[in-house]
Amino acid sequence: APAHIAAIRALVVAGRFDGGAITRVQDNYVVQWAARPGPGKMLTSGGAAAVAAGSTATPGGVAVGTGPGPAHPAILPAEYERPVKGLQITPLGSTDTYAPSGFADGWPVARDSKTGTAWLAHCYASVGVGRDNPPDTGDGSELYAVIGHGPRHLDRNITVVGRVIDGIADFSALPRGTGPLGFYKTPAEQTVITRVRFATAADPRYEVLASASPAFAAYLQARANRTGFFVRPAGATDLCNVQVPVRRVAK
């Protein structure tokens, strides 16, 4: 999703997330946060934030008004899927309810052989871009992270731009919103975002198990055929039940 990622990076450079807030925490679904409104914009109720979880816009929550402005781009292209050509996909090895699935470069992906396309799956810790009803695709000023069972029905409907590889437990531990769709009813309930910086500023180092490696293939088999405690191994696994191993390493 190069256009959406570029828009998010522009918002970070402009400091638009500094002073923003976590506006929504819906149990077994998503944590959502918003940048400060751009010049000439104002906080509104419901709106794009409500649609970030695949629901219709519902009053009661706090969202950020959208529209063009400095560091606030116009409607971006729909980046819900991409050509599968060029991707090295390690098959999941189990039947998936939604589409043939696997892993590419450490990312959970699904594909459609008829259209020749592939897309990032909505799994735990995935980060997506909130949007309003089509043709709106979101501008990157509202983002969410999945904190529950993978809402795969959102696949190819909302742009997935990344995933949380460190700190998702802090998101999951936030108090749930008591308003519709998990929005906080008042600004006092929200968690204020002090600042957002690129990871390169802190230079953390992480290693991800290569999904094209023999070790990853063995890992998939182990997830599908568990031993020890298990009396009856499932013999299969769900795409979102395979957490790609990530570890932080010393510099």
What positions do the PLM features span?
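Cyclophilin-like peptidyl-prolyl cis-trans isomerases
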Residues: 1-251
